[in-house]
Amino acid sequence: MKRVDIKIGFNCNNKCKFCVQGNKREHYQNKSINEIKEALYKAKQNELTGVVFTGGEPCIHPNIIEAVRYAKELGFEYIQIQSNGRMFAYYDFCQKLILAGANEFSPALHSSQEQIHDFLTSNKGAFQQVVQGIKNLKKLNQYILTNTVITSRNYQDLPALAELFIDLSVDQFQFAFVHILGTAAENQDWLVPKKSEIMPFVKRGLDIGINAGKRVMTEAIPYCFMEGYEDYIAEKIMPETQVVDAEGVIESYSDYRWKLGKEKRKECENCRYFNICEGPWKEYLEIYGWEEFKIIK
């Protein structure tokens, strides 16, 4: 599958302390429905088969239903809504999205503990809305793949969060290490944990999902931390993605990660995973350096 990721606007009803988009909401207006349709049409002409509506928070864009409907009319097979999940708490809104053509939903839940999730999203009540949203979508028989951003404040809770995902019957969950850009960069002194410290909790969380028969993934955690869990590295199966952003179009997000976003050192050439490992985000190395990373023979 090849897909297009369209950031339809940067307005948001949360203000996450790890947000990679930072203050873009203050500088960029929503894309108009015509701009969204143009991006969808071009993507379809280029034979892309999937679309992810994201942002910002796509569910508060005034034309989200029309945009989804147009994607369906064009014949996109996979129409995903990547969201903080709060609007999914409204059952009728979920119904409208599904009727328009959405068939994958990716809400974000960052802790099994209400106070931690609400703290990280800067929004009291957000946890309850996301949980209700997942319940609504399951009642409507939708495919749910959640995303959790790993930070210093929630990594110890990952096993309990995995248990909650099982209880909520999500289809897939992913643990993604924080990308230190935007608001995350502003908070990096207290927000960013060492990868070596999080791994026991990440692996316990993965085990819980694996044992329950769920699809589980990690993102932005290199192979040298994932011994025995190499099959659960998201980058190895990520579809080729075009990103339509405020500043322009990234034709290949994979190329961006490999050539600009992430980094490997000379010693990595001796690792068995050198040709398939992307390495860590560059910003992580500026904080902690290479000491934790090792060569896998």
Which role does the model predict for each range below?
Residues M1-V4, P107, F175, T218-E219:
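Short glycine/serine/threonine-enriched helix-capping/active-site loop
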Residues K2-E35:
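Canonical Radical SAM [4Fe-4S] cluster-binding loop centered on the CxxxCxxC motif
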Residues I8-K15, E57, K264-C268, F274:
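Cysteine-centered iron-sulfur cluster-binding motifs in ferredoxin-type domains/subunits
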Residues N23, G55, S83, L109, ...:
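Residues that line or immediately flank small-molecule/substrate-binding pockets and catalytic motifs
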Residues R25-H27, E114-L120, G182-Q188:
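A short acidic, helix-capping loop that chelates divalent metal ions and anchors anionic groups
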Residues I33-V52, H61-F177:
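Radical SAM/AdoMet-radical enzyme domain recognition
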Residues N123-Q128, Q132-K135, K139-Y256:
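Radical SAM enzyme [4Fe-4S]-AdoMet core and its adjacent flexible, acidic
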Residues E230-K297:
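Flexible mid-to-C-terminal extensions adjoining Fe-S/redox cofactors in radical SAM and related proteins
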